[in-house]
């Protein structure tokens, strides 16, 4: 086997690899798969934010089948960070308060938000199931106590403990931070996935869990 042939083969392999790399780099395009937010979410580096609402049917569907698997595939690059949208649903404000408290409890206990023991997960899916599966409306905004009780019962928390936890500075900071969810949600609705606070993924372009994870990985390293 001649050295000239080996050199030619080596160059061919290098060219093929370069073309493959170039193709991979251009597999996702701005304006088709994602957009750059004009107003980035502050202090969101190395995060995969999901803006959601308990009253959003697609948020429920994505949380059942997509959010967890994608977050697991990109956990080495970004941390999953839920942002509840206070402005959607009759009880958006109350839901945000319940979720912020439960997230703080999970974080203090070192429990993943995807773990079966997560109080956030228990409350979230209790609301999803009640609202979307059983069509519960809690008197259409006239019974906030009943709405809150649904989440607290699922998470195993008393009203007194909830009231006390709600005053925690960490919880209040979370609620303040979540106000940025509105500007993101009004672009294409919810759910809305944002990488590093800058890149909004177009949900209509998501083809599979693997392709979404690949997109998140690409955006996370920009």
List where the protein language model places each region:
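Catalytic His-Asp charge-relay segment
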Residues: 49, 192-193
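Compositionally biased, intrinsically disordered low-complexity regions enriched in proline and serine
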Residues: 24, 29, 35, 129-132, ...
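Extracytoplasmic thiol/disulfide redox context detector
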Residues: 2-93, 173, 179, 184, ...
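Cysteine-centric redox/oxidoreductase cores and disulfide-bonded domains
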Residues: 87-189, 196-198, 202-215
